[in-house]
Amino acid sequence: YFIDRPMGFLYTPDLSKAPQLPEIKKSQLFADFGWATMRTSWEKDATMLAVKSGHTWNHSHADANSFIIFHKGVDIIKDAGNCWYPNPSYRNYFFQSEAHNVVLFNGKGQSREQQYHGSMLRGYLHYLLDADNVKYVLANGTGPYSDQFSRNFRHFLWIDDVIYMIDDLKTHDVGHFEWLWHPGGEAEKRGIDLNITNGNSSVVVRLLYPRLLAKSD
């Protein structure tokens, strides 16, 4: 019925000639809205790293330099969650930096006023590289954090099965940093590692600097 009508190509597309997997690039930088994605393949159980650093306002959360990782069909490192807009938890938590995988300084992320007034200076993504087993992208979140940071760079270097995340940070004042990670599965600390497991998907998080995780008792 729909095939012979103008909207038919949307509701009943002919997929008989479509390739089994998309014949497009595995890495892409969407500079205008501040997203970059890198993946091992287009298979369903592939690994994908997605990085965000762009504008902050309204639907665009306070998550400059944040990232998520999908592995074997599971968002194994993810945002904290979501809720509907009228719920006070949306504006008080889920929109804010604390609900994302970012670095806090003295317990604070991006200014909470950016939700309704926007960030005067946006974040950026640069230098996307995909050489198959070596991938790279730089996230520059200095702008949205400029009330606290004079430099907020996050380098993502993906070599084979290891993703190195290097934070280059400089703040206006003396204080302490806090790294936020939101696991998408059971998290267990084993020695200097944090193991996150969800079904057949798992990831090992190891902090190298400024210090290792303390060994478990």
Protein language model annotation of sequence segments:
Residues 1-2, 83-217:
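CBM-like, beta-strand-rich accessory domains located in the C-terminal region of large
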Residues 1-77, 130-134, 138:
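Carbohydrate-active enzyme catalytic cores, enriched for enzymes
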Residues 46-49, 59-60, 77-79, 86-87, ...:
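Short helix/loop capping segments that flank catalytic or ligand/cofactor-binding pockets
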